[in-house]
UniProtKB/Swiss-Prot annotation:
GO biological process: one example: translation
Family note: Belongs to the universal ribosomal protein uL24 family.
HAMAP family per the UniProt record, alphabetical: Ribosomal_uL24_B
An MF annotation (GO) of this entry: rRNA binding
Keywords carried by this UniProt record: Ribonucleoprotein, Ribosomal protein, RNA-binding, rRNA-binding
Organism (species): Histophilus somni (strain 2336) (Haemophilus somnus)
Subunit relationships: Part of the 50S ribosomal subunit.
PROSITE patterns: RIBOSOMAL_L24 (PS01108)
The protein's role, per its UniProt record: One of two assembly initiator proteins, it binds directly to the 5'-end of the 23S rRNA, where it nucleates assembly of the 50S subunit.
The protein, known as: Large ribosomal subunit protein uL24
NCBIfam families: rplX_bact (TIGR01079)
One Gene Ontology CC term in the entry: ribosome
Amino acid sequence: MAAKIRQNDEVIVLAGKDKGKRGKVTKVLPNGKVFVEGVNIITKHEKPVPALGKAGGLVKKEAAIDVSNVAIFNPTTNKADRVGFRIEDGKKVRFFKSNNEII
């Protein structure tokens, strides 16, 4: 099945500590999780690796969010929207369900 949320889509977070935040999808994992730019930031404790010249300490990085907790952002309506699929000129295209605009 084709993915409704893809890399470089602008999404809005629907649930969790970052609810309401918007960002761009940087990575989509096959297990149904996505990485969103600037959202779901965690602090990792990393050990130093002298062989690679890496210093240890606290590192802030993005964690994955389940795809069910994000929705694609429709710039014309300024709201979260649902995605549909249809065939146009022999190609499968995605469209916003609220205004039938192709993504």
